[in-house]
Amino acid sequence: MRLRTSLGVASACASVASAALKVTEDNSTITLANDRLTSTFAKDKGRVSELFLDGQDLLGPISGNTGVGPYLDCYCIPSGFYTAGSTDPRLEVVQGTDSTGTKYAGVILNDTYTPTGQQFQQYWFLRDGETGLHTFSRLAYYNETTPFLRNLQEFRTLFRPNTELWTHLTSSEAQTAPLPSKEAIANEVVVQDATWRFNNTPNDAYYTQFSEYFTKYTFSNLWRDNSVHGLYADGTNSNGTTYGAWLVMNTKDTYYGGPLHSDLTVDGIVYNYLVSNHHGEGTPNITNGFDRTFGPQYYLFNGGKGSKSSLEDLRSEAETLADPGWNADFYDSIAKHVIGYAPSSKRGSVQGQVKLPKGSTRPIAILTVDGQYFQDNSVEASSHQYWAEMGQDGTFQLDHVKEGKYRLTVFADGIFGDFVHDGVEVQAGKVTKVQETWEQESAGVEVWRLGTPDKSSGEFLHGDAPDPTHPLHPPQHFIYWGAYDWQQDFPNGVNYTIGSSDPAVDFNTVHWSVYGPTPANPDVEYDTTHDWTINFSLDKKQLQQRKTATLTIQLAGAKTAAGNTDVYNATEPYANLALESYINEQKEPLTLLVGFNQSSSCIVRSAVSCYQVRSRMEFPADWLNVGNNVLTLHLPRNATDYETAVLPGTVYVQYDALRLELA
């Protein structure tokens, strides 16, 4: 039996039950409930207004946009932010039995933003026997009069509680902390956009255990590494019973940016960031005919019923669901309700092996839109993406891949460059075989390398190394950049010697043009920041009969005056940023130009891996000396931009790895 009820007009109270699953409607609300989870939707807002697990209120009282969710909002109308359901929310109920014999019920929000005609849909589904909500989100734009509207800058769903129930937030084992107390928040000091200092409440648990600084970016993560994040209640405010609220990324194919996309996860709100440019990656344009359905993802609520389970145990339970094969039969059954969702009948698999270069570690195989760099797949708004960790023999398997043509990209820690193969055809119901060999790039004999090519600047000072000053030891880069003191770390600037210096101590995770001011130091430093020195020695044998040298620089991120907007501003002299490399006494530099559309807000938003930029620069080998040599890495001195938010104006680059080759 399938029941479909339009709820745009108020109706009398009605209840339809199927086993434990029940749908109830009155003039103002719709309620979906099974034996354990009850979710109530407000008709006038088009969002979840109440959520109970085993009788425990998970949201708390509504206050503005808190005490609600999951709900959908965006930064996508001409003026900026919009919450779906704000104009003319129309809710619709669907019910049925899926192919496994399990009852389900769903609520679908339909809303149109009248000034532009943008259509929003948000889907929530509850199954019998589950304690979570399956979600899909859709945006459509059909407007021939204004064929280009703007970019889709943010598109997200939010679980936004307003209750003392939740005590901890977590996005990984290393990013787990107590939530700051009300007292800490009341006495916080703003130090940057969405960043606060808790120095006025030094006894707060967050301060003593995790950090003096709090920012939502501390809990951001790469999509490669992130499948589950959320909130935990340790029982302090729930009579000893523990609870978890999790966003489970069981599918990632409708996000953009591939496995290196990083985004916000949790900060007291549990986010599902479907689209954003927080760390500088591209976003799709909203043009006539744009029609995109994101999902599914799953908001899981667990614990309860006297649970004493730890945060780690409840998170592990959520992690078991973070698999695109989980509930695939159910999603096939509800595809008839979800506009734009591709069921299994439109999906195939890719099975392959790429012979890897010697020294490869953590290899990964990525499918993204054909003909485009994998971080740029948002240029094709309808594109899908997939990736899988590879075996050390280069084997990989990708299932549930939507039919179409893809680019295969492989990269691995320890190897410069990527393997790229276009034209991988995926057909529904079939297995596509791939057999390739990755011949790593080479410009001769490698003389030296600095850093590990791994798409990250985390191996350098204040990167991935754990913070020794707090017992939870978060990686240092997750903490606000201003917690560190450049003048103390590098009073004479960076002067690194190949073979004797320690990259974790003597090479910073970010090359600033300007540093400061910080909360602890009002000084602004630009004399020791913009030029870095790398010393290296070559013997006569290394240079014998060598004609060409090649310097490779890979950047894990770079911020130009364009910030993360991808917009060129002619009034900003550093919209395109030149990183210049000077060899010994040569007057002409080798130049890596970071374009305005390659810029990212990386370290200032607590990240060490953002939009990747690289260059291989040749020069005559006779520029090099037998004996001592000096490479100077130069950024423009005191180069800044105009910032509308409370953010540092300096430009900067973050090195992934460098190497010198001779041929």
UniProtKB/Swiss-Prot annotation:
Which coarse location class applies to the principal site listed for this UniProt protein? secreted
Q: Which reaction does it catalyse?
A: Endotype eliminative cleavage of L-alpha-rhamnopyranosyl-(1->4)-alpha-D-galactopyranosyluronic acid bonds of rhamnogalacturonan I domains in ramified hairy regions of pectin leaving L-rhamnopyranose at the reducing end and 4-deoxy-4,5-unsaturated D-galactopyranosyluronic acid at the non-reducing end
Keywords annotated in UniProt: Carbohydrate metabolism, Cell wall biogenesis/degradation, Glycoprotein, Lyase, Polysaccharide degradation, Secreted, Signal
The glycosylation sites are 27, 110, 143, 239, 285, 495, 535, 569, 597, 638
The subcellular location is: Secreted
Q: Which GO terms describe its biological process?
A: cell wall organization; polysaccharide catabolic process
**Where do transmembrane segments lie in this chain?**
none
Q: Which GO terms describe its molecular function?
A: carbohydrate binding; rhamnogalacturonan endolyase activity
| Role of this protein | Pectinolytic enzymes consist of four classes of enzymes: pectin lyase, polygalacturonase, pectin methylesterase and rhamnogalacturonase. Degrades the rhamnogalacturonan I (RG-I) backbone of pectin.
User: What is the recorded name of this protein?
Assistant: Probable rhamnogalacturonate lyase B
Question: Species name for this entry?
Answer: Aspergillus flavus (strain ATCC 200026 / FGSC A1120 / IAM 13836 / NRRL 3357 / JCM 12722 / SRRC 167)
Organism ancestry: Eukaryota, Fungi, Dikarya, Ascomycota, Pezizomycotina
Q: Which gene encodes it?
A: rglB
